[in-house]
Each structure stands twice: as structure tokens, then as C-alpha cells.
Amino acid sequence: MKNNQFAIVPTDSETAIAELTKIHFITPDMDALTTVPAVYQALLAKSLPEVHTASGLTHKFNNIMATSQHTLSEWLADATIVNNQVFYNVGLQLLGFLPGQDFELADPLLAMRDIHLPMVGDSAFDREALYYAWYLLLNTRGNNGQTLIESLTTRGYFVPFYQLPNDQKPLFFNGKAQAVFDTNALIRDVVYVEAPLDTDHDGQRDLLKVEILRPAETETGLKVPVLYTASPYNQGINDQAGDAQMHNVDVPLTAKEPDENTYADVEFQPTTAQLPAARTATTTTDTAEETFSREKSYTLNDYFLARGFAVVYAAGIGSIDSDGLAPTGDVDETTSTVAIIEWLTGKRQAFTNRDGNIAIKAWWCNGAVAMTGRSYLGTLATAAATTGVAGLKTIISEAAISSWYDYYRDNGLVVAPDTFQGEDTDVLAAEVFSRSLKAGDAHQIQPAFDQKLAELTADQDRASGNYNRFWDERNYLKNVDKIKADIIMVHGLNDWNVKPRNVANLWDKLQAVPVTKKLILHQGQHIYINNLQSLDFTDMMNLWLSHKLYGLDNHAETLLPNVLVQDNTQAQTWHGYDNWWQDTTDALDFKVQYKELVPADHTVDQRAAHFTDKLPDKLFDHYKHHLDSWQRDLLQEDKLNPLYDHRLLFKSWQAPEDQLLVGIPHVAGSVAVNKNFGMLSFMLIDFGAARRLTVSPQILAAKALDLGYHWREDDLKDFKLAGETPFKMITKGHLNLQNRHHPWHAEAIQPNVFYDFSVDLQPLFHHLLKGHQLGLVIYATDMKMTIRGNQDLQYSLNLNDIRLHVPMKKITD
């Protein structure tokens, strides 16, 4: 294990002792202890909250080695001092590390340094130094990725604190909320928020079902903040309807009618519809009428339920027990998302049921809201933030879409999210329209939704792939300047579902917005990262939310790096940076000749290179069903490779030193095609034999992360180094040749005439090792993402015109 810990708050000795006293590790009876070993033994006893007898403690101490020759019990019997070797021998075992396997009893300090664990340098401790070392140990992450204080939490240490009076809750330790709330006593309510919408046109404002989990202490006056997850999947998914709506991608690319469109021609202009009157409450109450059993939860939310935060889930318009129609990303969906926040902050009404008009307020909420979630969930958090809604203090958006065009299209082409060939906005709407799963409701509402679905299918315009008003309405980047909430963005550099451009564009736009923003880039695909062993992500979010929602002064904004990136060359290695590419001035610039990428100052030959897109039918069918085989063959250099004549491949010289490629690679050149339409696709490749990180985090221990005491669990995971591979695709991009200048403007092209093109690839942050080669692949049909017409398209590129620009940072550590 290699520890990467960013959420530990630097603390002086006086503050540490005060905090230890607050959580009862230092108690008045310890004043009578006259020796440091006696104080140490008292601290050790408190670290075993599951043990209630002296004989039980002796048994536990007998299973811990203090030195290579003595158990902890034996050592305590004769100890006159506490030195750092014994302290960290014992401490490492309390943290779950094994002597002889994870560290050596003869030199625990070496392991502390190698694992990157914080420690005190004193060779021998007086009482004050012991307390400080113990405080630091409690805040040190163990082999299961949790701090020692979190480990004690899961074993019941904070159970006596459940009885604290409300004015002593929540309880913070080292700047983070602790689990002093009984999750067995959580209150579960259902309410129905009235949104300022009538999307199903039934003459009534849409009601939105909301599921609430809140601490029991709210019943006696404690007001708590909310973690709100807007999840269209929350009430169920109609997979069958989605599958039926999927589009055939084995269709030909066709010529578009040229146009003179400018952005003004496709800009979405919001309209104000006449709304039905709001419902009139007949009475008010503080008590919900409905409850629920097990919500579809996010484990990060589960963690905070034990720590003084309420959690709210809402699936929004078109979902079971709500009104409205699922619209996939439009303004109405944003409005429905924001309506929940407005109710939580007292600005909108909700009711205890769908028919009785009995109003209920969020009287238990302190008015501070954060939004959490990944993918569509994080997308709606981003959408809500761009409205500037009051009360939304922060969002933690993971793998979030910032523009739906960048999710389903690319430069005038239909480009699917990875593994979802044929999906589009209408498919997603059909899936999340869970009202269709309730027969009675579906009987009434299905005709209206079928009409809505037909509108989505028409307006998304798969025939052209162009950016239009439909997509402009679903572009949250237009309203980034309205954001008032502070933001943490999390994204996978290998996420080809929600591609990196989505987070990169949001991050770039936020540079001009006066909010605090943080960015975490990991090496995964479309995943959550709150269960990684090597990163204290959950503690980071605890630090952040304790500050943002409870107003705790814990230095969260300065302790967390602006940009935190997982290294792709080493396991369990993370680096902090001031920015992504925005502070970058260096770059690698290449021309091409024959099969090489050469430095831009080289003279290259005047010649053209050619490839054909059409494959033999049998091979085409094989690749459709074996996409990994297609990508592997695309990158093979062997002339017998079936794709050798179906793409161009250029490789740089070996890197003379490690290079950090960051930001947006850019390819320019000139191309001709034998038809009046065409497309180009591009990949950047890291060529070089190396052990690379696994595509997905591997389970290290199932259900090893306890999120509270007798509460929910999560698997402990992390990326590992896999077997050696010869190359890795690091980014890609696509271009419709009729959209060489703008995605909303289709230009005519003539067969066999060369046209200049210029295209940005997906942003990257990649460590290229010394001796590796950078590769550029130029091809047409992307079997994983574009439509696949398998047409007789012949492409020619002027090699002397091709340029590749890749921004880079100097590696300084």
C-alpha cells in the first residue's frame, strides 16, 4: 500500500490534546497516571471499544507484538518509556499492517516512510508528545484505506456519543464530522415537491417524489444540511423500452445539405409557458404520511448519514410516483432538479401525498445543500449549479456531462458513449421514464410520452449529427457564469462513456468564475472512487462538506489540491498540481513523414498517403462483435494485419525523458475523399512495453469498508499493475469532413479535392515514459463509437500538411 492523504488537518499539540479530550481519549482519571507507559496503556485500552474486561484486553495485547521478542502485554509489564519504535510497531498493527509482511518490527519507521504515513520524529515520548503522536495515529490511514478513528467507529467507539445533547452535535475531529448519529434510528420520509412545470400538460403542476433520510435528532430540534442526489434511475429503469428504442448504427454516412448557419441560428431561446396555478394547501403539518424501506443509495451518502447529514434522493419528472415526462437534459429537467433545493431552503411547497394538499416544510434542514452523484446524477448537479440557485453550497460532480452534444456527438458526427452504440437521448428517456413501469399510470400517460419520445427522436437529428437548438438547450456550459456553488469535479481519464472533454470544458470555463473549484482525475473509466485504498477521497469529502455545509473553519479550500491526478505509470500514486493545461506553455509539435512523427522543425517530403474505409464483409462483421480485436488490430504494425491498409499510423522517436502530456492535443492537415462526404477519426497511442494499470479497480477485500457502526459497507478496491502490454490508447477524436469549422455549419465538399481540417482531440493528462513512443493513428470508422456504414470511401492525406500539437508540463518530482 502507498498512502496518499490530503485531508489531514495540520494541528498543534494544544489543539490535538483538546480534541482528544473532546472525544474522550483523554479523560480526567488519566491525570492520576504517573508514567508515560501507563498513559499509553490507557490509550490502547480505549482503542479496543469492543472489549470490556481486563482479561479481554490482555488477550488482545497478547496478539500484538511490541518488539521482535515481546508481545504488547509483555512489554507493558516492564516498560519505563515509550519510544517511537514500539509506538509505531503497535500503531502499524492497529492500522491493519502485518509484521514480516507489510513491515519489519526491527524498523517500523522505514515502513512508515515507504507507505507515506505521517509520524512523530521524537525517539522517546513524554506525556504531551505521546498525546500528539496518538492524535496523529488516529488520523492515519490503515491497510483498509480508513483512518484509525474510522476503524474505531466501525467497532462502536462512538456509540456512547449517540446520547450527546443536540448542542454538542455534530462532533468534529481533525476538521471532519464523526459518526455520532445512530443510523438505526434514521427517519425516512416521502414528500411530493410541487415544481413550476406542467410537462405532461394535464393542467396541474408536476409533483416530484422525494425520499428523505434524516437523523433522529432532527425531531428534537437539530437542523442539519442535506446531501441531495438527483437520480433519474432512482425509482427504476425500463430496460425493455430502452432496448426497443436503440438505433441501428450499421447505416451509411450521407452527404449533408450545405448551409450558412452561424451560432445565432442554432442558439436556444428559452420561452416562458403559462403555468397552471399552484396548489392551495388545505393545512400544514410537520409529519410525513409516507415512508420507504431501502433506497437506491450511493455509499458516500451512506457514510455521511452517520455523521450528521441528511440525504435526499429524487428521480425527477417522468419517474414512478412523480408527474411529468422524461426529457433527457433539457431546461425542464434542470427546473425539476432545482425545485427540490428550493423546497429544502423554504422557497417552494411540498405535500405529504399526491392528492390531499397537506403542505409540509423541510423544517429540519439548516438551509445548506450539496449535490452528489456520478454520470447522469453528476450531470444534474452541474445543471442545477448553473442556475445559481440559492442554498446550493457545493456540488461533487463525478463523471458528469457538461454538454449533451459532447456526450452523443462529436464535430458533426453521431458518436456513441463507449459500450452504448446506438444509444441517444430518446433511448435514455425511454429507460428512465419509469412511470411506464406502473400499469395504471402508464395507461393514462403513455400516449403523451410517446409523442414526447417522437419529438426527441426528431430533434436530436441523428441524420446530420449537427449541433442545433436541441443540443444548445442541453449545453450547461452556456451558463457557467451563473454558478455560485463551489465545485469538486471527479473524472476518469479513461472514461469513454462521459468523455474527458465534458469535465475539461467545465473546468476551463470555471477559471473565470469566482468560486472555489477542485478537480480530481483518476485512471479509471466510468466509476466512483470513494472506495480506493490509496486515496483518502471520503475523508477529503468529509473535510470539504464539514466546511461548506456546517461552516467549520478547517482549511479545506487550501488543504485539497486544485488538481489531483492519478499517475498512469505507477500503482497508488497521486500528484497535486495548480492547474490542468491552463498554466502550460510547453508542447510537443510534430510533422509526419512516411510512418513517423518527426519534430516540427524537420523538413518532410511532399507526398500523400491513402487508406480505404471499406472492410470485407466477413471481417466487418467480426469486428462488430469483437471490438477489442478491432482496436488491437488497428494499432498493429505488421503488414499482414487486416487493418494495415485501413488506417495511417505514425510513431515518434523514443522519448528522451519522461514527459507529462496535458490538455488538448490538436491535429491539423488536409484530406481528400472520393465522395462528397466523409469522416476522420484519430487516436493518440502510448507505444512501449510496460506493465500498465488495470482498466478497472480490483477488489482487494469484499465489504471491507464499514461506513458506520452496524451500518452499510463497501468493497475496498484499487488499481493494480497488470501484465505487460505493448501500447495503450490515451485519447481520440472524430470529425465529419463537412463540419470542419463548426458543428452547426455543414459545408459542401467535392470528391477528390483536398480540404484543410483542424480538430481537437479529447483532453488528456498522461505520463509518457522515457523510451516510449507517441503514436498518431488516422482512420475513419470507429467501430466502438461512430456509425458503421462500411462504405467504399477512399481517403488521401497530404503528409506534409499534417501537424500534431500536444501540450506538456515539465516533470518536477
UniProtKB/Swiss-Prot annotation:
Top EC class, one word: hydrolase
Taxonomic lineage: Bacteria, Bacillati, Bacillota, Bacilli, Lactobacillales
Catalysed reaction equations from the record: Hydrolyzes Xaa-Pro-|- bonds to release unblocked, N-terminal dipeptides from substrates including Ala-Pro-|-p-nitroanilide and (sequentially) Tyr-Pro-|-Phe-Pro-|-Gly-Pro-|-Ile
Gene3D superfamilies: 1.10.246.70, alpha/beta hydrolase, Galactose-binding domain-like
Subunit structure: Homodimer.
Keywords on record: Aminopeptidase, Cytoplasm, Hydrolase, Protease, Serine protease
Listed EC numbers: 3.4.14.11
Gene Ontology molecular function, alphabetical: aminopeptidase activity; dipeptidyl-peptidase activity; serine-type peptidase activity
One GO term (biological process): proteolysis
Similarity remark: Belongs to the peptidase S15 family.
Membrane-crossing residue ranges in chain numbering: none
Active-site residues, record numbering mapped to chain: 375 (charge relay system), 495 (charge relay system), 526 (charge relay system)
Domain of life the protein comes from: Bacteria
Annotated localization: Cytoplasm
NCBIfam families noted in UniProt: PRK05371.1-2
Name of the molecule in the record: Xaa-Pro dipeptidyl-peptidase
Main location: cytoplasm
One Pfam family, short name: PepX_N
Functional summary from the UniProt entry: Removes N-terminal dipeptides sequentially from polypeptides having unsubstituted N-termini provided that the penultimate residue is proline.
GO cellular component: cytoplasm
